[in-house]
UniProtKB/Swiss-Prot annotation:
GO terms for molecular function: aminoacyl-tRNA deacylase activity; ATP binding; isoleucine-tRNA ligase activity; tRNA binding; zinc ion binding. A motif ('KMSKS' region) lies at residues 606-610. This is Isoleucine--tRNA ligase. GO terms for cellular component: cytoplasm. Keywords: Aminoacyl-tRNA synthetase, ATP-binding, Cytoplasm, Ligase, Metal-binding, Nucleotide-binding, Protein biosynthesis, Zinc. It comes from Haloquadratum walsbyi (strain DSM 16790 / HBSQ001). The keyword Translocase does not apply. IleRS has two distinct active sites: one for aminoacylation and one for editing. The misactivated valine is translocated from the active site to the editing site, which sterically excludes the correctly activated isoleucine. The single editing site contains two valyl binding pockets, one specific for each substrate (Val-AMP or Val-tRNA(Ile)). It comes from the Archaea. A motif ('HIGH' region) lies at residues 47-57. Monomer. Catalyzes the attachment of isoleucine to tRNA(Ile). As IleRS can inadvertently accommodate and process structurally similar amino acids such as valine, to avoid such errors it has two additional distinct tRNA(Ile)-dependent editing activities. One activity is designated as 'pretransfer' editing and involves the hydrolysis of activated Val-AMP. The other activity is designated 'posttransfer' editing and involves deacylation of mischarged Val-tRNA(Ile). It is an enzyme of class 6 (ligase). SUPFAM superfamilies: Anticodon-binding domain of a subclass of class I aminoacyl-tRNA synthetases, Nucleotidylyl transferase, ValRS/IleRS/LeuRS editing domain.
Length: 1059
């Protein structure tokens, strides 16, 4: 066998294996090995090609890769095409930053076509960089054939889906109030709005009544919306009061909700008030008021129905109980305005600037106008109070600009018309965790508004809508509700007025913009908008298999078997797929969904540049390695729970994998020496003992637990079960138990049994861990076996019932508890494990514990290093010592109580019959005056375990001392062999000089044992001459307070025994 490094160095392993995979086409070999297996249709949630891999995307891709590897190893032909979201604002904003653009006007001046080409270049270049990022953490996907949302085949998938939606009558065009980014100058979806705490103006304003004394009082944090005010809303069931508010010699009548009067008047700093009259909200309906900025906004909403009071459901008994309503902005205001059949007054354009309809504010950006509007309200005498308000407010998900609400013409998928169908379809998918589906996701879907699918941008999939703009015969230029939705490139070629080659047409703007369609006497032009970028990824389940262009894969695979993303996708990709899948096909496009959390810092805070707490995957890999990072990320709860990244945790994972490396290394020199090939391990050969049978049974339990965990996507359970088996069962228990069998010189059935067992355990554990730590397991597999191109082409281990033995596992669990308790008792008694003890007594609480100890007494004696194991139901060597009960003795003996207690302290049970005598006075002692503590004698140490108590006899005999000192000397000699880097089979000569004559005699009694354990060929007496030999090593040691000088040299460089 090739040499294996003493230490696990992830970088060395990973570099070597990366080269090996490339040289052997290991990925292709793995796919080929499972080409005829049942299909598993995995769909990759496409990340935007707008940045580098961060810790969250590293976790996401590692999780996907692990699941794909597991599915392959369990007999599946996995669709593993990676995806990239390459359109939309995420790309546009990055390109604008590169070009130094600040507005759409900059893009128009630069040229739309040139800008789109820059977006395409940026997306493609970043995609290539992200390919490298993901491959750098060992992700095996079809990197030569990713699905890209900018490809004509994929764009066609979106067109086809939208056509299906239109055929169902679910496409609608109309003016609605939408979230709008004034910098990007486009509508954005409600689920794209991100929220932060901001400080806004807080003003209370009087709206003077037209036909009555007094004013309605409203409160708002958006003074800029007051020019668009159309009506005031009240709650029909609330009680409102007309109060005469007094301030000095002045007074005025204000109309406020009863519950808000005190707070509002405090804001206005009024001295006192009286209630003039009370009204219900219903009674206020129809009251008219004067626009507070009528002089500044001459063309304010002055049409029929404007400037009146109406009831509305969105009014609450908060602030003033009256709501200033501007249907041109607020979404609830717009909806109520539509119900009231009011015109929609919108004095703001797509740049977020006031139009000429806003009078003196024309050309001002809306938020920049806040101060001017507040001043004007004050000068008009209608500003009751002005301050600031801290609250959460939305901003654009890509450029961070605060959004505005603007009523604009948009295109919608009316998902509200199929809400019941959507909610029913949710039940057709299984979610991990299930609560994410039944609570978070269902609630989001239930409240989802109609989907605004149009964006007033450039880099995206163009809306495939051609709208009728005139009548070919009459030249009528009025628009209508007549439009055509094109579903494929072939259809476009057939229906367009211009020549279109479907195989070559670029479906992006501006190529499709000039195309027209003339049918039935009408001329149709394409709507200039592009799709909401969430439409792109919503069709991934068929776009990734090139449907509708290719139908075979769709017929065989669709819907997706499995998708996985973070919990923010409940309102993102999980929703968009459900929405489009249901609207276009009537089905949910996925069968299983896994939702993981976010990767945060060690304190659970979001990682960000401003906090300076970002941990990059590259940084983690440089410190610990790819496999340790993968295993660390996957060892935490994967279902809906955020990860708090800790460097210590990553370091511990590297240490854990190093333990596995040491387990892997341990038998190699012995096997090499004996010519044993682990690839040919056969459990039917050799002789098994109880620990072999136990570790093989534990292996079956681990396989069962691990497989069950994978099937429920409890990846952390799988990872931790495997690693705990490696560290606790194999390394700390089994390896220690078989060390002497491996060390033995002669061939034996027992040694062959140990070889076969450990080879089997290693082979199957390597395969169990392969999806988690692909580099390390590949290195181990190729060293131990290598019969296949790659470990990842092998089958995942299955449970072998022949080796299952639950009784043995239970008994061994008891043994290990007893062993741990014995170690604790030794520590209390100051006796190291290397030193034997005369006996260990197990006081068992029940028969099952006693039976287990007796069944495994031989092994247990060896593990706890004792000459004898005794099992008892009650340990009868405890010494009882009396403890006085002061609460009883004090009242009974008064002034003599303390002397009585001193006499009782530490006494025996005879006190109860004989009493105590003090200065010739006899005192009778009763049961209630004493409690008894049972303590072991000085030479016994004790420790409890779940099934009883372990007592360790730490008394010393000459033979025990001799063996103890010998074991200490053996450990030092073995350490020196390591320092000399000697092979396992290298024989040595040894010199041992003990400063204490008595201890020297004890060690001499064990000389044969020392020789056998250390492969000492001969002992020599003259240690002083050893320093003359350059290959010899001489060291001085402190062994239990005695100075022991040891010289060690390989036979080729013998120590001199001549004087």
């Amino acid at each position: 066998m090739d040499e294996v490094d003493d230490q696990y160095t992830p970088a060395d392993v990973e570099t070597a294996i990366e080269t090996y995979w490339d040289d052997t086409n290991a990925y292709e070999a793995t796919k080929e090995a499972h080409a005829d297996d049942p299909s598993f249709f995995f769909v990759d949630g496409p990340p935007y090609t707008s940045g580098q891999m961060h810790l969250g995307t590293a976790w996401n891709k590692t999780l996907k890769d692990a699941i794909i590897r597991y599915k392959r190893m369990t007999g599946h032909h996995v669709t593993d095409r990676p995806g990239y979201d390459m359109h939309g604002l995420p790309i546009e904003v990055k390109v604008e930053e590169e070009l130094g653009f600040e507005t759409k006007r900059d893009i128009e001046e630069y040229g739309m076509e040139s800008f789109i080409e820059e977006c395409k270049r940026f997306a493609v270049d970043n995609r290539k960089a992200m390919d490298e990022d993901f491959q750098s953490i060992g992700v095996w996907m079809d990197w030569d054939n990713p699905y890209e949302t900018l490809s004509p085949e994929y764009m066609e998938a979106a067109w086809w889906a939208f056509q299906q939606v239109d055929d169902r009558g679910l496409v609608e065009r109309g003016k609605r109030s939408v979230s709008y980014c004034p910098r990007c100058q486009t509508a954005i979806a409600a689920n794209e709005v991100e929220y932060d705490e901001i400080t806004s103006p807080s003003i209370y304003v009087r709206f003077p009544l037209s036909n009555k004394e007094g004013s309605l009082v409203i409160w708002t944090t958006t003074p800029w919306t007051i020019p668009a005010n159309t009506f005031v809303a009240v709650d029909k069931d609330l009680t409102y009061q007309a109060v005469r508010a007094e301030q000095g010699d002045d007074s005025e009548v204000l109309y406020i909700a009863e519950s808000c009067v005190e707070d509002v008047l405090k804001q206005g700093r009024y001295d006192d008030y009286t209630v003039v009259e009370e009204y219900s909200g219903d009674e206020l309906t129809g009251w008219e008021y004067d626009h507070p900025l009528a002089d500044q906004v001459q063309t304010y909403a002055d049409f029929a129905g404007a400037g009146e009071v109406y009831t509305a459901e969105y009014v609450e008994a908060d602030r003033t109980g009256l709501v200033h309503s501007a249907p041109g902005h607020g979404q609830e205001d717009f909806a109520r305005g539509q119900e009231l059949d009011l015109e929609t007054f919108v004095p703001v354009d797509g740049r977020g600037e006031f139009t000429e309809a806003a009078g003196q504010y024309t050309g001002t950006f809306v938020r920049d106008a806040n101060d001017e509007i507040i001043n004007d309200l004050d000068e008009e005498g209608v500003l009751l109070s002005s301050g600031t308000h801290e609250h959460r407010y939305g901003h654009c998900w890509r450029c961070d600009t605060d959004i505005i609400f603007l009523a604009t013409d948009q295109w919608f998928i009316t998902v509200t018309d199929i809400k019941d169908e959507l909610l029913d379809n949710i039940n057709d998918s299984e979610w991990y965790p299930q609560w994410a589906r039944d609570n978070r996701f269902r609630d989001f879907v239930a409240d989802a508004p109609d989907w605004n699918v149009s964006r007033q941008r450039y880099w995206g999939i163009p809306l495939p809508i051609w709208e009728s703009v005139d009548d070919a015969d009459t030249g009528d230029n009025s628009t209508s509700d007549d439009w055509i939705v094109i579903g494929t490139r072939e259809e476009l070629a057939e229906r367009a007025d211009q020549d279109v080659n479907p195989a070559e047409i670029d479906l992006h703007r501006p190529a499709v913009d000039p195309l027209t369609i003339t049918e039935n006497g009408s001329r149709y032009e394409r709507v200039p908008d592009v799709f909401d970028v969430w439409i792109d990824s919503s069709v991934a389940s068929w776009g990734t298999i090139d449907y509708p262009g290719e139908t075979d894969a769709y017929d065989e695979l669709w819907p997706a078997d499995f998708i996985v993303e973070a919990h923010d996708q409940t309102r993102g990709w999980f929703w968009s797929q459900l929405g489009m899948g249901t609207a276009a096909t009537g089905q949910v496009p996925y069968e299983e969904v896994m939702m993981h959390g976010f990767a945060n810092d060690e304190n659970g805070r979001k990682m960000s540049k401003s906090r300076g707490n970002i941990v990059t995957p590259e940084e983690a890999i440089d410190r610990a390695g790819r496999d340790p990072l993968r295993a660390y990320l996957l060892s935490h709860d994967q279902q809906g729970v955020d990860l708090s990244f800790e460097w210590d945790g990553l370091g511990e994972m590297q240490s854990t994998l190093n333990i596995f490396w040491n387990v892997f290394r341990f038998p190699l020199p012995y096997m090499d020496l004996d010519g044993y090939d682990p690839a040919t391990a056969d459990l039917s050969e050799g002789s098994m003992n109880i620990v072999d049978e136990w570790v093989l049974s534990r292996l079956q339990s681990v396989k069962a637990t691990t497989r069950a965990a994978w099937e429920e996507y409890e990846i952390d359970t799988a990872v931790n079960t495997i690693l705990e088996f490696i560290t606790d069962d194999v390394s700390r228990f089994y390896i220690k138990a078989i060390r002497e069998r491996m060390w033995a010189d002669e061939d034996s059935a027992s040694k062959r049994g140990a070889y076969a067992t450990l080879s089997t355990v290693l082979d199957e554990t390597i395969r169990l861990l392969a999806p988690i730590a692909p580099y390390l397991t590949e290195q181990m597999y190729q060293h131990l076996n290598g019969s296949e191109t790659t470990v990842h082409a092998l089958s995942y281990p299955s449970v072998d019932p022949e080796w299952q033995n639950e009784t043995l596992e239970s008994e061994m669990a008891v043994l290990r508890d007893v062993e741990e308790a014995a170690a604790n008792a030794r520590q209390q008694g100051g006796r190291k494990l290397r030193w034997p003890v005369p006996r260990v007594i197990v006081e068992a609480e029940d028969d099952s514990i006693a039976d287990a100890v007796e069944s495994l007494s031989g092994l247990l004696a060896d593990r706890v290093n004792t000459e004898a194991i005794e099992t008892v139901t009650q340990f009868d060597e405890l010494i009882e010592r009396a403890q006085p009960e002061m609460s009883v003795i004090g009242p009974e003996f008064g002034a003599d109580a303390q002397r009585v207690m001193d006499a009782i302290e530490g006494g025996s049970r005879e006190i109860l019959t004989e009493g105590v005598t003090i200065d010739g006075v006899q005192y009778e002692i009763t049961d209630e005056m004493i409690t008894f503590d049972a303590e072991p004698p000085a030479y016994i140490s004790a420790a409890d375990f779940d099934g009883g108590t372990v007592y360790v006899d730490t008394s010393l005999t000459e033979s025990i001392e001799a063996e103890g000192y010998a074991r200490d000397v053996i450990r030092r000699i073995q350490q020196m062999r390591k320092e000399l880097a000697l092979d396992v089979d290298t024989e040595i000569q040894t010199a041992v000089d003990v400063a204490d004559d008595r201890v020297a005699d004890l060690v001499a009694q064990q000389r044969d044992v020392v020789a056998t354990e250390t492969r000492t060929n001969a002992f020599v007496d003259n240690i002083d001459r050893a320093s003359e030999n350059g290959q010899a090593l001489i060291e001085e040691w402190d062994v239990e307070g005695v100075t022991v000088t040891i010289g060690v040299a390989p036979l080729k460089a013998q120590l001199s025994d001549q004087s």
